UniProtKB/Swiss-Prot annotation:
Keywords: Cell membrane, Coiled coil, DNA-binding, Membrane, Transmembrane, Transmembrane helix. InterPro entries: Jlp2/Ccd25, NFACT_RNA-bd. GO terms for cellular component: endomembrane system; plasma membrane. Belongs to the CCDC25 family. This is Coiled-coil domain-containing protein 25. Interacts (via cytoplasmic region) with ILK. Residues 141-185 form a coiled coil.
Amino acid sequence: MVFYFTSNVISPPYTMYMGKDKYENEDLIKYGWPEDIWFHVDKLSSAHVYLRLQKDQTIEDIPKEVLLDCAQLVKANSIQGCKMNNINVVYTPWANLKKTADMDIGQIGFHRQKDVKTMTVEKVSKIVNRLEKTKDERFPDLAAEKEARDREERNEKKAQIQEIKRKEKEEMKKKKEMDELRSYSSLMKSENMSSNQDGNDSDDFM
């Protein structure tokens, strides 16, 4: 089971999601998307909350209101963190999550520590209450969704390559036509010059 939430403080809204327990967190880690940003309470046990961005967005593009929603949601889903104020929440792109065979279930590390950001949050109940009203329980096929996403990306890249090749072919055709036109113009000019010279020669014999 995966819990989905909607951050509708801005338009268009953003989708957040988290697993029910550490076992589902394993699947979320495995089948995350490059557009996902991972959130967790720093140095405490908590849910793994993911924010899904648009393809053209980066972690720097997250609106501060949405960032706060994610932080409040992950804080509220920490047994210790939910009782504390001014706790640190860490967040990083899904691609920066590192999972090795010797790690416990639900445990992760980072490929690059410099890509991990930290923010300090206080408890704001009204934000958590607003998010809870959007809560939706689903049983998604995460592997199938990831494959569909990757397939779409492959098709987009294929279409882009085909478009580039089409433009290159078109440019080559135009260049060839221009070269032929210049060659024809040069030939006509040469023939005209020869014709004029022939005319001058005939005048000399008169």
